[in-house]
């Protein structure tokens, strides 16, 4: 799958996750499934395209109920929702369960 297609998929799943969370609650099976699916696609993006993406601490984590990382893009990408510099947030705990410590260090240590 192409880089841009993965980003579009992450955006679509993120929107669906937010709707499910608002309609059914954050503990709903569909909400949890969508959140996990989004995180899995974000992990795929970072693994398949490490030259075009990286992790950064989310600057707006204080507005959420858990610590978040931002999946950032080296260059902005034109998407169906406009120009994007990121591929949404990933909860820190999800990133820590999907990546090894070595991978986390690799995806954080980018000279951008």
Model-predicted regions and their roles:
Residues 2-17, 37, 50:
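Short amphipathic alpha-helical heptad-repeat segments
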Residues 8-9, 18-21, 45, 75:
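Intrinsic structural disorder/low-complexity segments
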Residues 19-32, 54:
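Charged, low-complexity interaction regions
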Residues 32-101:
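Acidic, low-complexity, intrinsically disordered interaction modules
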Residues 102-112:
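Short acidic DE-rich linear segments
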